[in-house]
Amino acid sequence: MQKTLKKNFTLSGITLHSGEISNIKVNPAPANTGILFKRTDLKVPHIETLLNAKIENVVFSELCTKLSNEYGHSVSTIEHVMSAFHGLGIDNAIVEIDKAELPILDGSSLEYVSEIERAGIKNLQAKRKIVNITRPIIFRDNDSYIKVTPANNMSINYTIVYDHKLINEQNFIFDLDSTYNYRNIISNSRTFGFKDEVEYLRDKGLIAGGSLENAIVLDNDGIMNQSVLRHDDEFVRHKVLDFIGDIYLLGHRVKGSFEIFKGGHRLTHELVKSIMSDKSNWNYDYDKSDLDDLTFSTLDHKKELSASL
């Protein structure tokens, strides 16, 4: 069955790139809404404030995932909340936001997970569609690549390589088969960066809100944070966290076996585009836990969505 929240929740915090305080309100949504972002700060017609979290709305942005609608309005750094939605099985939600960027919080998805669980999750009377990969697909960029092959569930095999003694080469294998696994194995892994890149990125107008409170920062000696790593392989686990958020831009959960080598946001976006570009790459399946053939009528769905917005 499709799922949403039982009630709304709010969060506030500094944004990673613009350095502003951003306030969000995450609301339940009716079946077949998907994940929808709504800019509450814009003084424009209502329809122009909405951004659907699907690959066709993704635009290029360094170091994060950014959506833009046909009216030129955007919202960025959505990957962590998208990861939490995917990891906890939330199919439908409306995220109201009063800035163009989501708060970075502690650099992981843990706070989103905690708030979703506190709000509660409820079933909706509609079957959950799943994107089922039907043939191998690969996207390469120099020595980086990402590929997917057909499978009965969603599995991730992720490898990162960095010239730093705390990272070197890290590999992590993860099956997105339970909310417990996502919460306890992935959700608290923080974003990371390198001290010698900070000045360069800030000169480009990025990471204005970055600090040791919301990212792991590495110098030549190790990590600069007073806190210790949450996992020895926290770096690659965070990459898995980002991937779980970005692959959800398919608009549905997915069945496929993913192998990623030296990946990132853009590589995942390109794979999603490749998947959706040819209907022979995939078909729709249904969650096997859905025993009843229950759907909202189009009219009921439109009425509920209108009321939610």
PLM segments and residue spans:
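C-terminal regulatory domains involved in ligand/effector binding and gene-expression control
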Residues: 1-91, 96-309
